[in-house]
Amino acid sequence: MNVYESLQTVLLFVVLLAMVKPLGTFMARVFQGERTILSPVLAPAESLLYGVCGVNSEEEMDWKRYARAMVLFNLVIFATLFAMLMLQHLLPLNPQKFPAFSWQLALNTAVSFTTNTNWQAYAGEQAASYFTQMVGLTVHNFVSAATGIAVAIAVIRGFARRTTSALGNFWVDLTRATLYILVPISLIAALVLVSQGVIQNFSAYQAVSLVQPVTYDTPKRDGTGSPVKDPTGNPVTERVTAKEVTIPMGPVASQEAIKELGTNGGGFFNANSAHPFENPTPLSNMLEILLILLIPFSLTYTFGAMVGNTRQGWTLLGVMLLILLASFAVLQGVESGGNPLVTKLGVHGANMEGKDTRFGLAGSSLFTVATTGTSCGAVNTMHDSLTPIGGMIPMSLMLLGELVPGGVGSGLYTMLAFAVIAVFVSGLMIGRTPEYLGKKIEVREMWMSVVTVLAAGVMVLILSGIAMISPSAVAAMANPGAHGLSEVLYAFASMANNNGSAFAGLSANTTFYNILGALAMIVGRFAPAVAVLAMAGSLAEKKYVPPSLGTLPTDKVPFALWLTLVILIVGALTFFPALSLGPIVEHLTMTM
Protein backbone atom coordinates (compact mmCIF):
# COMPACT_ATOMS: atom_id res chain seq x y z
CA MET A 1 0.00 0.00 0.00
CA ASN A 2 1.12 3.55 -0.62
CA VAL A 3 1.16 6.18 2.11
CA TYR A 4 -2.30 7.51 1.21
CA GLU A 5 -3.91 4.07 1.34
CA SER A 6 -2.15 3.24 4.61
CA LEU A 7 -3.30 6.47 6.24
CA GLN A 8 -6.92 6.09 5.18
CA THR A 9 -6.97 2.47 6.41
CA VAL A 10 -5.49 3.40 9.79
CA LEU A 11 -7.84 6.38 10.10
CA LEU A 12 -10.86 4.20 9.36
CA PHE A 13 -10.05 1.74 12.14
CA VAL A 14 -9.15 4.50 14.59
CA VAL A 15 -12.55 6.13 14.02
CA LEU A 16 -14.30 2.75 14.16
CA LEU A 17 -12.70 1.68 17.44
CA ALA A 18 -13.30 5.12 18.94
CA MET A 19 -17.03 4.70 18.25
CA VAL A 20 -17.32 1.19 19.72
CA LYS A 21 -17.61 2.21 23.37
CA PRO A 22 -20.03 5.15 22.95
CA LEU A 23 -22.37 3.26 20.64
CA GLY A 24 -22.02 0.02 22.61
CA THR A 25 -22.88 1.83 25.84
CA PHE A 26 -25.82 3.56 24.16
CA MET A 27 -27.21 0.25 22.89
CA ALA A 28 -26.85 -1.34 26.33
CA ARG A 29 -28.84 1.53 27.87
CA VAL A 30 -31.50 1.28 25.17
CA PHE A 31 -32.09 -2.44 25.65
CA GLN A 32 -31.98 -2.22 29.44
CA GLY A 33 -34.79 0.32 29.26
CA GLU A 34 -32.71 3.21 30.59
CA ARG A 35 -33.16 6.82 29.58
CA THR A 36 -30.98 8.02 26.68
CA ILE A 37 -30.42 11.26 24.83
CA LEU A 38 -33.08 10.25 22.29
CA SER A 39 -35.73 9.30 24.86
CA PRO A 40 -37.50 12.71 24.96
CA VAL A 41 -38.11 12.48 21.22
CA LEU A 42 -38.60 8.75 20.65
CA ALA A 43 -40.14 7.45 23.90
CA PRO A 44 -43.62 8.85 23.03
CA ALA A 45 -43.44 7.25 19.58
CA GLU A 46 -42.33 3.98 21.16
CA SER A 47 -45.24 4.02 23.62
CA LEU A 48 -47.67 4.86 20.82
CA LEU A 49 -46.47 1.88 18.78
CA TYR A 50 -46.94 -0.47 21.73
CA GLY A 51 -50.45 0.88 22.28
CA VAL A 52 -51.48 0.56 18.64
CA CYS A 53 -50.05 -2.97 18.35
CA GLY A 54 -51.33 -4.15 21.73
CA VAL A 55 -47.87 -4.93 23.10
CA ASN A 56 -47.33 -5.07 26.86
CA SER A 57 -43.81 -3.70 27.11
CA GLU A 58 -43.46 -4.92 30.71
CA GLU A 59 -44.16 -8.56 29.82
CA GLU A 60 -41.17 -10.81 29.17
CA MET A 61 -40.89 -14.05 27.19
CA ASP A 62 -39.09 -17.33 27.67
CA TRP A 63 -36.93 -18.54 24.81
CA LYS A 64 -39.74 -20.50 23.14
CA ARG A 65 -42.13 -17.54 23.04
CA TYR A 66 -39.32 -15.26 21.93
CA ALA A 67 -38.42 -17.63 19.08
CA ARG A 68 -42.07 -18.06 18.06
CA ALA A 69 -42.58 -14.30 17.94
CA MET A 70 -39.41 -13.88 15.88
CA VAL A 71 -40.39 -16.58 13.38
CA LEU A 72 -44.00 -15.34 13.14
CA PHE A 73 -42.89 -11.76 12.48
CA ASN A 74 -40.51 -12.87 9.76
CA LEU A 75 -43.20 -15.04 8.18
CA VAL A 76 -45.53 -12.04 7.98
CA ILE A 77 -42.95 -9.68 6.48
CA PHE A 78 -41.94 -12.41 3.99
CA ALA A 79 -45.54 -12.81 2.82
CA THR A 80 -45.93 -9.04 2.52
CA LEU A 81 -42.85 -8.64 0.35
CA PHE A 82 -43.70 -11.69 -1.76
CA ALA A 83 -47.14 -10.23 -2.52
CA MET A 84 -45.60 -6.85 -3.31
CA LEU A 85 -43.19 -8.38 -5.84
CA MET A 86 -45.93 -10.43 -7.49
CA LEU A 87 -48.16 -7.34 -7.78
CA GLN A 88 -45.44 -4.84 -8.67
CA HIS A 89 -47.02 -3.95 -12.02
CA LEU A 90 -50.19 -2.80 -10.23
CA LEU A 91 -48.49 -0.67 -7.58
CA PRO A 92 -47.57 3.05 -7.80
CA LEU A 93 -44.15 4.68 -8.28
CA ASN A 94 -43.26 2.53 -11.27
CA PRO A 95 -42.28 5.05 -13.97
CA GLN A 96 -40.44 2.42 -16.01
CA LYS A 97 -43.51 0.12 -16.05
CA PHE A 98 -41.58 -2.88 -14.73
CA PRO A 99 -43.60 -6.13 -14.78
CA ALA A 100 -44.19 -8.38 -11.79
CA PHE A 101 -41.48 -10.80 -10.68
CA SER A 102 -41.86 -14.48 -11.59
CA TRP A 103 -42.98 -16.55 -8.60
CA GLN A 104 -39.57 -18.25 -8.28
CA LEU A 105 -37.71 -14.95 -8.32
CA ALA A 106 -40.26 -13.35 -5.97
CA LEU A 107 -39.86 -16.27 -3.56
CA ASN A 108 -36.08 -16.04 -3.62
CA THR A 109 -36.06 -12.26 -3.27
CA ALA A 110 -38.62 -12.16 -0.46
CA VAL A 111 -36.72 -14.82 1.49
CA SER A 112 -33.47 -13.02 0.75
CA PHE A 113 -34.52 -9.65 2.18
CA THR A 114 -36.41 -11.22 5.09
CA THR A 115 -33.33 -13.16 6.20
CA ASN A 116 -30.96 -10.16 5.89
CA THR A 117 -29.20 -11.93 3.00
CA ASN A 118 -30.11 -9.57 0.15
CA TRP A 119 -29.04 -12.09 -2.49
CA GLN A 120 -30.20 -10.57 -5.77
CA ALA A 121 -30.88 -12.76 -8.77
CA TYR A 122 -32.07 -9.67 -10.64
CA ALA A 123 -30.65 -6.27 -11.60
CA GLY A 124 -32.30 -3.65 -9.40
CA GLU A 125 -32.47 -0.86 -11.97
CA GLN A 126 -33.91 -3.26 -14.58
CA ALA A 127 -36.52 -5.09 -12.48
CA ALA A 128 -37.59 -3.26 -9.30
CA SER A 129 -39.84 -0.19 -9.19
CA TYR A 130 -39.29 2.72 -6.82
CA PHE A 131 -42.19 1.48 -4.68
CA THR A 132 -40.63 -1.98 -4.43
CA GLN A 133 -37.22 -0.53 -3.60
CA MET A 134 -38.54 1.86 -0.92
CA VAL A 135 -41.56 0.24 0.70
CA GLY A 136 -40.51 -3.34 0.12
CA LEU A 137 -36.75 -3.76 0.14
CA THR A 138 -35.65 -0.77 2.25
CA VAL A 139 -38.22 -1.46 4.97
CA HIS A 140 -37.05 -5.07 5.09
CA ASN A 141 -33.48 -3.84 5.45
CA PHE A 142 -34.54 -2.17 8.71
CA VAL A 143 -36.65 -4.96 10.19
CA SER A 144 -34.33 -7.84 9.23
CA ALA A 145 -31.41 -6.02 10.83
CA ALA A 146 -33.52 -5.26 13.91
CA THR A 147 -34.43 -8.95 14.15
CA GLY A 148 -30.77 -9.94 14.30
CA ILE A 149 -30.03 -7.33 16.96
CA ALA A 150 -33.03 -8.45 19.02
CA VAL A 151 -31.90 -12.09 19.01
CA ALA A 152 -28.37 -11.06 20.02
CA ILE A 153 -29.72 -9.01 22.94
CA ALA A 154 -31.83 -11.95 24.11
CA VAL A 155 -28.73 -14.16 24.02
CA ILE A 156 -26.77 -11.60 26.04
CA ARG A 157 -29.53 -11.65 28.67
CA GLY A 158 -29.19 -15.43 28.80
CA PHE A 159 -25.58 -15.02 29.91
CA ALA A 160 -26.29 -12.06 32.20
CA ARG A 161 -29.38 -13.31 34.07
CA ARG A 162 -29.62 -16.01 36.74
CA THR A 163 -32.31 -18.54 37.67
CA THR A 164 -34.96 -17.12 35.34
CA SER A 165 -36.59 -18.19 32.10
CA ALA A 166 -37.17 -14.62 30.87
CA LEU A 167 -35.10 -13.33 27.94
CA GLY A 168 -36.96 -10.09 27.29
CA ASN A 169 -39.74 -9.18 24.87
CA PHE A 170 -39.10 -9.64 21.15
CA TRP A 171 -41.51 -6.87 20.13
CA VAL A 172 -39.88 -4.38 22.48
CA ASP A 173 -36.36 -5.30 21.36
CA LEU A 174 -37.39 -5.10 17.70
CA THR A 175 -38.96 -1.68 18.18
CA ARG A 176 -36.04 -0.25 20.14
CA ALA A 177 -33.45 -1.56 17.69
CA THR A 178 -35.28 0.17 14.86
CA LEU A 179 -36.27 3.44 16.55
CA TYR A 180 -33.21 4.20 18.64
CA ILE A 181 -30.37 2.70 16.60
CA LEU A 182 -31.07 1.99 12.94
CA VAL A 183 -33.27 4.94 11.98
CA PRO A 184 -31.20 7.78 13.55
CA ILE A 185 -27.84 6.55 12.25
CA SER A 186 -29.30 5.82 8.79
CA LEU A 187 -30.79 9.31 8.59
CA ILE A 188 -27.44 10.96 9.32
CA ALA A 189 -25.56 8.60 6.99
CA ALA A 190 -28.02 9.20 4.13
CA LEU A 191 -27.51 12.96 4.37
CA VAL A 192 -23.73 12.54 4.27
CA LEU A 193 -24.02 10.23 1.26
CA VAL A 194 -26.16 12.78 -0.57
CA SER A 195 -23.46 15.38 0.08
CA GLN A 196 -20.99 13.07 -1.68
CA GLY A 197 -23.18 12.66 -4.76
CA VAL A 198 -25.43 9.68 -4.03
CA ILE A 199 -28.73 10.42 -5.78
CA GLN A 200 -32.15 10.70 -4.11
CA ASN A 201 -35.04 11.45 -6.46
CA PHE A 202 -38.18 10.05 -8.09
CA SER A 203 -37.36 11.06 -11.66
CA ALA A 204 -37.91 8.76 -14.61
CA TYR A 205 -34.83 7.19 -16.17
CA GLN A 206 -32.90 9.50 -18.52
CA ALA A 207 -32.14 8.37 -22.10
CA VAL A 208 -28.99 10.01 -23.48
CA SER A 209 -27.67 9.64 -27.04
CA LEU A 210 -24.03 8.64 -27.36
CA VAL A 211 -21.69 10.89 -29.32
CA GLN A 212 -20.29 7.78 -30.96
CA PRO A 213 -21.93 4.30 -31.08
CA VAL A 214 -20.23 1.65 -28.96
CA THR A 215 -19.92 -1.97 -30.10
CA TYR A 216 -19.19 -4.69 -27.56
CA ASP A 217 -19.55 -8.43 -26.98
CA THR A 218 -22.01 -9.78 -24.42
CA PRO A 219 -22.71 -13.37 -23.30
CA LYS A 220 -25.51 -15.00 -25.28
CA ARG A 221 -28.31 -16.49 -23.16
CA ASP A 222 -31.06 -18.99 -23.88
CA GLY A 223 -34.74 -18.64 -23.02
CA THR A 224 -34.16 -19.56 -19.37
CA GLY A 225 -31.46 -16.94 -18.89
CA SER A 226 -28.61 -19.46 -18.77
CA PRO A 227 -25.45 -18.76 -20.80
CA VAL A 228 -25.14 -20.52 -24.16
CA LYS A 229 -21.93 -22.55 -24.44
CA ASP A 230 -19.95 -23.99 -27.34
CA PRO A 231 -18.99 -27.71 -27.53
CA THR A 232 -15.87 -27.07 -25.40
CA GLY A 233 -17.91 -25.57 -22.56
CA ASN A 234 -16.91 -21.95 -23.11
CA PRO A 235 -19.58 -19.20 -23.22
CA VAL A 236 -20.85 -17.98 -26.60
CA THR A 237 -20.93 -14.21 -27.08
CA GLU A 238 -22.85 -11.96 -29.45
CA ARG A 239 -21.94 -8.49 -30.72
CA VAL A 240 -24.17 -5.57 -29.72
CA THR A 241 -24.04 -1.92 -30.85
CA ALA A 242 -25.37 0.73 -28.47
CA LYS A 243 -26.40 4.16 -29.81
CA GLU A 244 -27.86 5.55 -26.59
CA VAL A 245 -27.54 4.89 -22.89
CA THR A 246 -30.24 4.91 -20.23
CA ILE A 247 -29.24 6.53 -16.95
CA PRO A 248 -31.28 5.14 -14.04
CA MET A 249 -32.61 7.41 -11.30
CA GLY A 250 -34.25 6.75 -7.96
CA PRO A 251 -34.28 7.18 -4.15
CA VAL A 252 -30.85 5.64 -3.65
CA ALA A 253 -29.32 7.38 -0.61
CA SER A 254 -32.12 6.38 1.77
CA GLN A 255 -31.64 2.72 0.82
CA GLU A 256 -27.84 2.89 0.68
CA ALA A 257 -27.46 3.99 4.30
CA ILE A 258 -29.44 1.15 5.87
CA LYS A 259 -28.07 -1.27 3.27
CA GLU A 260 -24.63 -0.83 4.82
CA LEU A 261 -25.56 -0.10 8.45
CA GLY A 262 -27.84 -3.13 8.70
CA THR A 263 -25.28 -5.35 6.92
CA ASN A 264 -27.97 -6.06 4.33
CA GLY A 265 -26.04 -5.43 1.12
CA GLY A 266 -28.66 -5.46 -1.61
CA GLY A 267 -27.89 -2.73 -4.11
CA PHE A 268 -30.29 -0.31 -5.76
CA PHE A 269 -28.22 -0.93 -8.90
CA ASN A 270 -26.82 -4.16 -10.28
CA ALA A 271 -23.25 -2.90 -9.84
CA ASN A 272 -24.03 -2.28 -6.15
CA SER A 273 -21.50 -0.04 -4.39
CA ALA A 274 -19.28 0.04 -7.48
CA HIS A 275 -21.95 2.24 -9.10
CA PRO A 276 -21.11 5.96 -8.88
CA PHE A 277 -24.71 6.76 -7.89
CA GLU A 278 -24.33 4.50 -4.83
CA ASN A 279 -20.70 5.12 -3.90
CA PRO A 280 -19.25 8.10 -5.79
CA THR A 281 -16.09 9.09 -3.88
CA PRO A 282 -13.29 7.65 -1.74
CA LEU A 283 -14.89 9.38 1.26
CA SER A 284 -18.25 7.73 0.63
CA ASN A 285 -16.39 4.42 0.27
CA MET A 286 -14.76 4.82 3.69
CA LEU A 287 -18.09 5.87 5.21
CA GLU A 288 -19.81 2.78 3.82
CA ILE A 289 -17.09 0.50 5.22
CA LEU A 290 -17.48 2.25 8.58
CA LEU A 291 -21.25 1.72 8.50
CA ILE A 292 -20.82 -1.97 7.67
CA LEU A 293 -18.53 -2.62 10.65
CA LEU A 294 -19.99 -0.19 13.18
CA ILE A 295 -22.85 -2.09 14.84
CA PRO A 296 -21.28 -5.59 14.77
CA PHE A 297 -18.14 -4.31 16.52
CA SER A 298 -20.09 -2.10 18.94
CA LEU A 299 -22.35 -4.97 20.01
CA THR A 300 -19.31 -6.64 21.59
CA TYR A 301 -19.08 -3.72 24.02
CA THR A 302 -22.84 -3.93 24.58
CA PHE A 303 -22.30 -7.57 25.51
CA GLY A 304 -19.56 -6.71 27.98
CA ALA A 305 -21.60 -3.91 29.53
CA MET A 306 -24.71 -6.06 29.98
CA VAL A 307 -22.85 -9.02 31.53
CA GLY A 308 -20.97 -6.69 33.86
CA ASN A 309 -17.46 -7.23 32.48
CA THR A 310 -16.48 -5.08 29.52
CA ARG A 311 -13.20 -6.99 29.11
CA GLN A 312 -15.27 -9.94 27.88
CA GLY A 313 -16.54 -7.77 25.05
CA TRP A 314 -13.10 -6.41 24.20
CA THR A 315 -11.80 -9.99 24.03
CA LEU A 316 -14.40 -10.96 21.43
CA LEU A 317 -13.72 -7.76 19.50
CA GLY A 318 -10.00 -8.57 19.51
CA VAL A 319 -10.64 -11.99 17.97
CA MET A 320 -12.86 -10.47 15.29
CA LEU A 321 -10.34 -7.75 14.52
CA LEU A 322 -7.41 -10.17 14.37
CA ILE A 323 -9.01 -12.44 11.77
CA LEU A 324 -10.40 -9.50 9.78
CA LEU A 325 -7.06 -7.67 9.57
CA ALA A 326 -5.21 -10.89 8.71
CA SER A 327 -7.69 -11.50 5.88
CA PHE A 328 -7.23 -7.94 4.64
CA ALA A 329 -3.44 -8.33 4.65
CA VAL A 330 -3.59 -11.58 2.64
CA LEU A 331 -6.10 -10.20 0.13
CA GLN A 332 -4.15 -6.98 -0.31
CA GLY A 333 -0.94 -8.97 -0.79
CA VAL A 334 -2.19 -11.44 -3.39
CA GLU A 335 -4.08 -8.79 -5.38
CA SER A 336 -1.10 -6.42 -5.42
CA GLY A 337 0.98 -9.31 -6.79
CA GLY A 338 -1.15 -9.38 -9.92
CA ASN A 339 -2.75 -12.11 -12.01
CA PRO A 340 -0.25 -15.00 -12.46
CA LEU A 341 -1.30 -15.55 -16.09
CA VAL A 342 -0.75 -11.89 -16.95
CA THR A 343 2.54 -11.80 -15.05
CA LYS A 344 3.82 -14.69 -17.20
CA LEU A 345 3.33 -12.46 -20.23
CA GLY A 346 5.71 -9.92 -18.76
CA VAL A 347 3.00 -7.49 -17.63
CA HIS A 348 3.59 -6.66 -13.99
CA GLY A 349 1.37 -4.78 -11.58
CA ALA A 350 -1.61 -5.23 -9.31
CA ASN A 351 -4.70 -7.16 -10.37
CA MET A 352 -7.04 -4.24 -11.04
CA GLU A 353 -9.60 -6.18 -13.07
CA GLY A 354 -13.05 -5.65 -11.55
CA LYS A 355 -11.84 -2.82 -9.31
CA ASP A 356 -12.53 0.90 -9.52
CA THR A 357 -9.55 3.23 -9.68
CA ARG A 358 -11.35 5.85 -7.58
CA PHE A 359 -11.18 3.47 -4.61
CA GLY A 360 -7.77 1.97 -5.33
CA LEU A 361 -6.57 -1.49 -4.39
CA ALA A 362 -6.66 -0.92 -0.62
CA GLY A 363 -10.13 0.65 -0.68
CA SER A 364 -11.39 -2.28 -2.74
CA SER A 365 -9.71 -4.95 -0.61
CA LEU A 366 -10.87 -3.41 2.66
CA PHE A 367 -14.45 -3.18 1.40
CA THR A 368 -14.27 -6.81 0.28
CA VAL A 369 -13.20 -8.22 3.66
CA ALA A 370 -15.61 -5.91 5.51
CA THR A 371 -18.60 -6.97 3.44
CA THR A 372 -17.85 -10.71 3.66
CA GLY A 373 -16.58 -10.66 7.24
CA THR A 374 -20.02 -9.28 8.06
CA SER A 375 -23.25 -10.53 6.50
CA CYS A 376 -23.45 -7.42 4.31
CA GLY A 377 -22.65 -8.65 0.83
CA ALA A 378 -22.48 -5.19 -0.77
CA VAL A 379 -19.58 -4.96 -3.21
CA ASN A 380 -17.44 -2.23 -4.74
CA THR A 381 -15.28 -4.87 -6.42
CA MET A 382 -16.28 -7.76 -8.66
CA HIS A 383 -15.32 -10.75 -6.53
CA ASP A 384 -15.37 -13.05 -9.56
CA SER A 385 -12.42 -11.05 -10.95
CA LEU A 386 -10.21 -11.59 -7.90
CA THR A 387 -7.26 -13.95 -8.19
CA PRO A 388 -8.03 -17.51 -7.02
CA ILE A 389 -6.49 -17.01 -3.57
CA GLY A 390 -7.92 -13.50 -3.46
CA GLY A 391 -11.39 -14.91 -4.14
CA MET A 392 -10.86 -17.59 -1.49
CA ILE A 393 -10.47 -14.91 1.22
CA PRO A 394 -14.03 -13.51 1.07
CA MET A 395 -15.35 -17.03 0.51
CA SER A 396 -13.53 -18.27 3.62
CA LEU A 397 -14.77 -15.36 5.72
CA MET A 398 -18.32 -16.41 4.88
CA LEU A 399 -17.63 -20.09 5.43
CA LEU A 400 -16.25 -19.39 8.92
CA GLY A 401 -19.81 -18.44 9.83
CA GLU A 402 -20.01 -14.67 9.30
CA LEU A 403 -18.53 -13.81 12.70
CA VAL A 404 -15.57 -11.48 12.09
CA PRO A 405 -17.44 -9.38 13.05
CA GLY A 406 -20.50 -10.91 11.39
CA GLY A 407 -23.90 -9.43 10.71
CA VAL A 408 -25.74 -7.07 13.03
CA GLY A 409 -26.62 -9.36 15.92
CA SER A 410 -25.94 -12.63 14.13
CA GLY A 411 -22.20 -12.11 14.23
CA LEU A 412 -22.17 -11.70 18.00
CA TYR A 413 -24.37 -14.69 18.79
CA THR A 414 -22.39 -16.91 16.42
CA MET A 415 -19.16 -15.77 18.09
CA LEU A 416 -20.68 -16.56 21.50
CA ALA A 417 -21.55 -20.05 20.26
CA PHE A 418 -17.91 -20.51 19.25
CA ALA A 419 -16.85 -19.19 22.67
CA VAL A 420 -19.00 -21.86 24.34
CA ILE A 421 -17.37 -24.54 22.16
CA ALA A 422 -13.90 -23.20 22.95
CA VAL A 423 -14.62 -23.22 26.69
CA PHE A 424 -16.06 -26.74 26.49
CA VAL A 425 -13.04 -28.12 24.61
CA SER A 426 -10.63 -26.46 27.03
CA GLY A 427 -12.58 -27.94 29.94
CA LEU A 428 -12.21 -31.41 28.46
CA MET A 429 -8.47 -30.87 28.07
CA ILE A 430 -7.94 -30.03 31.76
CA GLY A 431 -10.59 -32.34 33.18
CA ARG A 432 -12.92 -29.70 34.64
CA THR A 433 -16.54 -28.80 34.08
CA PRO A 434 -16.39 -25.92 31.60
CA GLU A 435 -17.76 -22.53 32.67
CA TYR A 436 -18.36 -19.31 30.77
CA LEU A 437 -19.31 -16.10 32.55
CA GLY A 438 -20.17 -18.03 35.69
CA LYS A 439 -22.48 -20.49 33.92
CA LYS A 440 -21.71 -24.20 33.61
CA ILE A 441 -21.57 -25.38 30.02
CA GLU A 442 -23.30 -28.74 29.74
CA VAL A 443 -24.67 -31.04 27.05
CA ARG A 444 -27.67 -28.89 26.07
CA GLU A 445 -25.55 -25.77 25.56
CA MET A 446 -23.03 -27.72 23.51
CA TRP A 447 -25.67 -29.21 21.23
CA MET A 448 -27.23 -25.82 20.60
CA SER A 449 -23.89 -24.13 19.95
CA VAL A 450 -22.92 -26.88 17.49
CA VAL A 451 -26.20 -26.40 15.59
CA THR A 452 -25.56 -22.64 15.54
CA VAL A 453 -22.07 -23.08 14.14
CA LEU A 454 -22.63 -25.91 11.66
CA ALA A 455 -26.17 -25.43 10.28
CA ALA A 456 -25.12 -23.09 7.48
CA GLY A 457 -21.99 -25.09 6.64
CA VAL A 458 -23.93 -28.32 6.24
CA MET A 459 -26.33 -26.59 3.85
CA VAL A 460 -23.42 -25.19 1.81
CA LEU A 461 -21.80 -28.58 1.27
CA ILE A 462 -25.01 -30.51 0.60
CA LEU A 463 -26.49 -27.99 -1.84
CA SER A 464 -23.18 -27.43 -3.64
CA GLY A 465 -22.91 -31.20 -4.12
CA ILE A 466 -26.45 -31.36 -5.51
CA ALA A 467 -25.66 -28.49 -7.88
CA MET A 468 -22.62 -30.31 -9.26
CA ILE A 469 -24.76 -33.27 -10.36
CA SER A 470 -27.73 -31.24 -11.59
CA PRO A 471 -27.64 -30.45 -15.35
CA SER A 472 -29.63 -27.22 -14.95
CA ALA A 473 -27.32 -25.99 -12.19
CA VAL A 474 -24.19 -26.81 -14.18
CA ALA A 475 -25.63 -25.10 -17.27
CA ALA A 476 -25.89 -21.85 -15.28
CA MET A 477 -22.11 -21.78 -14.75
CA ALA A 478 -20.37 -19.42 -17.17
CA ASN A 479 -16.96 -20.93 -16.43
CA PRO A 480 -15.91 -24.59 -16.53
CA GLY A 481 -13.52 -26.40 -14.21
CA ALA A 482 -12.30 -25.28 -10.81
CA HIS A 483 -13.55 -21.72 -11.18
CA GLY A 484 -17.04 -22.96 -11.99
CA LEU A 485 -17.01 -24.99 -8.77
CA SER A 486 -15.82 -21.88 -6.92
CA GLU A 487 -18.78 -19.93 -8.30
CA VAL A 488 -21.27 -22.51 -7.03
CA LEU A 489 -19.54 -22.93 -3.67
CA TYR A 490 -19.41 -19.15 -3.25
CA ALA A 491 -23.11 -18.82 -4.13
CA PHE A 492 -24.31 -21.29 -1.51
CA ALA A 493 -21.78 -20.01 1.05
CA SER A 494 -23.21 -16.55 0.48
CA MET A 495 -26.85 -17.59 0.68
CA ALA A 496 -26.57 -20.02 3.61
CA ASN A 497 -24.54 -17.51 5.63
CA ASN A 498 -26.93 -14.66 4.74
CA ASN A 499 -24.29 -12.61 2.95
CA GLY A 500 -25.66 -12.01 -0.53
CA SER A 501 -22.51 -11.26 -2.54
CA ALA A 502 -21.71 -13.43 -5.55
CA PHE A 503 -19.21 -14.58 -8.12
CA ALA A 504 -21.05 -12.95 -10.99
CA GLY A 505 -20.22 -15.65 -13.54
CA LEU A 506 -23.10 -17.74 -12.18
CA SER A 507 -26.53 -17.15 -13.74
CA ALA A 508 -28.55 -17.23 -10.52
CA ASN A 509 -32.03 -16.44 -11.87
CA THR A 510 -32.96 -20.05 -12.59
CA THR A 511 -35.54 -22.28 -10.94
CA PHE A 512 -32.81 -24.41 -9.35
CA TYR A 513 -30.89 -21.59 -7.69
CA ASN A 514 -33.99 -19.57 -6.80
CA ILE A 515 -35.65 -22.43 -4.90
CA LEU A 516 -32.63 -24.16 -3.35
CA GLY A 517 -31.12 -20.76 -2.62
CA ALA A 518 -34.26 -19.80 -0.70
CA LEU A 519 -33.98 -23.03 1.29
CA ALA A 520 -30.34 -22.29 2.11
CA MET A 521 -31.20 -18.77 3.29
CA ILE A 522 -34.06 -19.94 5.50
CA VAL A 523 -32.04 -22.66 7.21
CA GLY A 524 -28.95 -20.47 7.48
CA ARG A 525 -30.92 -17.71 9.20
CA PHE A 526 -33.42 -19.43 11.46
CA ALA A 527 -31.73 -22.68 12.51
CA PRO A 528 -28.85 -20.82 14.24
CA ALA A 529 -31.17 -18.13 15.63
CA VAL A 530 -33.57 -20.61 17.24
CA ALA A 531 -30.71 -22.81 18.46
CA VAL A 532 -28.87 -19.92 20.09
CA LEU A 533 -32.10 -18.73 21.74
CA ALA A 534 -32.54 -22.23 23.17
CA MET A 535 -28.98 -22.06 24.50
CA ALA A 536 -29.68 -18.65 26.02
CA GLY A 537 -32.85 -19.93 27.68
CA SER A 538 -30.93 -22.79 29.26
CA LEU A 539 -28.15 -20.49 30.47
CA ALA A 540 -30.58 -17.97 31.97
CA GLU A 541 -32.04 -20.69 34.21
CA LYS A 542 -28.65 -21.63 35.66
CA LYS A 543 -27.19 -20.37 38.92
CA TYR A 544 -24.07 -18.25 38.97
CA VAL A 545 -20.91 -20.21 39.78
CA PRO A 546 -18.13 -18.04 41.28
CA PRO A 547 -14.75 -18.43 39.54
CA SER A 548 -12.21 -20.71 41.21
CA LEU A 549 -8.52 -21.48 40.72
CA GLY A 550 -9.37 -23.92 37.94
CA THR A 551 -11.68 -21.56 36.02
CA LEU A 552 -10.42 -20.58 32.59
CA PRO A 553 -10.17 -16.75 32.37
CA THR A 554 -12.15 -15.78 29.27
CA ASP A 555 -11.19 -12.11 29.26
CA LYS A 556 -7.47 -12.58 28.69
CA VAL A 557 -5.22 -12.84 25.62
CA PRO A 558 -4.64 -16.65 25.91
CA PHE A 559 -8.38 -17.32 25.62
CA ALA A 560 -8.64 -14.91 22.68
CA LEU A 561 -5.91 -16.84 20.86
CA TRP A 562 -7.53 -20.16 21.78
CA LEU A 563 -10.90 -18.97 20.48
CA THR A 564 -9.26 -17.83 17.25
CA LEU A 565 -7.65 -21.24 16.84
CA VAL A 566 -10.95 -23.06 17.45
CA ILE A 567 -12.71 -20.93 14.82
CA LEU A 568 -10.01 -21.60 12.23
CA ILE A 569 -9.83 -25.34 13.00
CA VAL A 570 -13.60 -25.81 12.68
CA GLY A 571 -13.58 -23.88 9.40
CA ALA A 572 -10.61 -25.81 8.03
CA LEU A 573 -12.00 -29.24 8.94
CA THR A 574 -15.36 -28.40 7.40
CA PHE A 575 -14.41 -26.69 4.16
CA PHE A 576 -10.78 -27.37 3.26
CA PRO A 577 -11.63 -30.32 0.93
CA ALA A 578 -14.13 -28.18 -0.99
CA LEU A 579 -11.74 -25.24 -1.18
CA SER A 580 -9.01 -27.58 -2.41
CA LEU A 581 -11.13 -28.52 -5.43
CA GLY A 582 -12.02 -24.91 -6.20
CA PRO A 583 -9.77 -21.87 -5.64
CA ILE A 584 -6.69 -23.81 -4.52
CA VAL A 585 -6.65 -26.02 -7.63
CA GLU A 586 -7.31 -22.97 -9.80
CA HIS A 587 -4.37 -21.14 -8.23
CA LEU A 588 -2.04 -24.11 -8.76
CA THR A 589 -3.20 -24.41 -12.37
CA MET A 590 -2.47 -20.74 -13.05
CA THR A 591 0.97 -20.76 -11.44
CA MET A 592 2.31 -24.04 -12.87
UniProtKB/Swiss-Prot annotation:
The chain crosses the membrane at residues 7-27, 71-91, 136-156, 179-199, 287-307, 314-334, 411-431, 449-469, 473-493, 515-535, 559-579. The keyword Transport applies. One of its GO terms (cellular component) is plasma membrane. One of its GO terms (biological process) is potassium ion transmembrane transport. It is a multi-pass membrane protein. Its main location: membrane. Keywords: Cell inner membrane, Cell membrane, Ion transport, Membrane, Potassium, Potassium transport, Transmembrane, Transmembrane helix, Transport. InterPro entries: KdpA (IPR004623). Pfam families: KdpA. One of its GO terms (molecular function) is potassium ion binding. It is found in: Cell inner membrane. The system is composed of three essential subunits: KdpA, KdpB and KdpC. Part of the high-affinity ATP-driven potassium transport (or Kdp) system, which catalyzes the hydrolysis of ATP coupled with the electrogenic transport of potassium into the cytoplasm. This subunit binds the periplasmic potassium ions and delivers the ions to the membrane domain of KdpB through an intramembrane tunnel. HAMAP family: KdpA. Belongs to the KdpA family. This is Potassium-transporting ATPase potassium-binding subunit. It comes from Geobacter sulfurreducens (strain ATCC 51573 / DSM 12127 / PCA).
